[in-house]
Amino acid sequence: MSAYIAPSQIAQRQLEYFNGKHVLVAGEVEDLFPLELVAHCESVEVFTSNYSYYRQIRTSDKVKSHFGSEFDIETQADMVLLYWPKAKAEAEYLLAMLMTKLGINTEIVVVGENRSGIKSIEKMFKEYGPVKKYDSARRCSFYWGTCLNEPKPFNQADWFKSYEITLGEQSLTVKSLPGVFSHGEFDLGSRLLLETLPKLSGKVLDFGCGAGVLGAFMAKANPEIAIEMCDINAYAITSSQATLEANGLSGRVFASDIYSDTAKDYRFIVSNPPFHSGLDTNYNAAETLLGQAPKYMTANGEMIIVANSFLQYPPIIEKAFNNCETLNKTNKFSIYYAKKS
């Protein structure tokens, strides 16, 4: 069994495309294929919005690695290896940013699972130049193309989706970049959680903050709290910062791979935990979030989360806290509460 994800395996079949190139790897890359690629091209850089992957790849001195929502550093890259992201809007964002940064005559290789919608590259790349499929294997596709047209100027501010949401008497302006959970909408789970929350105090962590809806609402409704917001996704970090700023709020927003960069003295942990990784369901982060939560709380710390009702979270919470209460429930979502004892 290969150590590489299927899109990397199809790229591995076509190594001659990378000969003599300075390659910038971007998108939904999850494995260490970029380290192998070093032997087949002039240089490799990795640009990722995934903090967990960044923590892994940055330990190697074979490649330069960058984490963020915008690639705004000097580079000698003349080819992009794009792992097709699950959100089409994120693919459009990455193409606009990277083609503008690297310019005319930049070559591009695009790899991804067919179910991810990679076929969209055929229309999406037309404004930059020709692109064509050259290989299919493992239910994946391999495209190669070249940017022959002058890309339009790229300004990240143009890519924010801005929308208003109202809860009771509170209203909020939300700023969201492509690739962020619930991009451009107020999801029902978060709404139910906010409607159920008690009065908050002390240091509060919004874990998996997305566009900052939970954290900003909590800060607005509880002006005396010290709000902290974390996410694994760089687009979420930038979006949450923009949401706070748009509403005249302040708080600490930072990247964290579950609890890797958090404090250990939260009075409240509030979350709409993620359970998707790429195109697949992945409960690992949520299980660690719930199971390890007491270690990152004050003596009387409390945790309140929303989850799809079919997810088996109560036993995990019960094991960690020795208690778990359902505060609210619909036919789709449940609000779970636990207190450190």
Swiss-Prot record:
Query: CDD domains, per this entry?
Result: AdoMet_MTases
GO cellular component terms attached to this protein's record: cytoplasm
Parts forming coiled coils: none
UniProt keyword Electron transport, yes or no: no
Question: What EC numbers are recorded for this enzyme?
Answer: 2.1.1.172
Catalytic class of the enzyme: transferase
Principal cellular location given in the protein's record: cytoplasm
Query: Pfam families per the record?
Result: MTS, MTS_N
What are the GO MF terms of this UniProt record?
16S rRNA (guanine(1207)-N(2))-methyltransferase activity; nucleic acid binding
Keywords attached to this Swiss-Prot or TrEMBL record, sorted alphabetically, are: Cytoplasm, Methyltransferase, rRNA processing, S-adenosyl-L-methionine, Transferase
What superkingdom does the record give?
Answer: Bacteria
Location in or out of the cell? Cytoplasm
Keyword match Transferase: yes
* Quaternary context: Monomer.
Q: What does this protein do?
A: Specifically methylates the guanine in position 1207 of 16S rRNA in the 30S particle.
Regarding protein family, the annotation reads:
Belongs to the methyltransferase superfamily. RsmC family.
Q: What is this protein called?
A: Ribosomal RNA small subunit methyltransferase C
Supply the source organism for this entry. Vibrio campbellii (strain ATCC BAA-1116)
Q: Coding gene?
A: rsmC
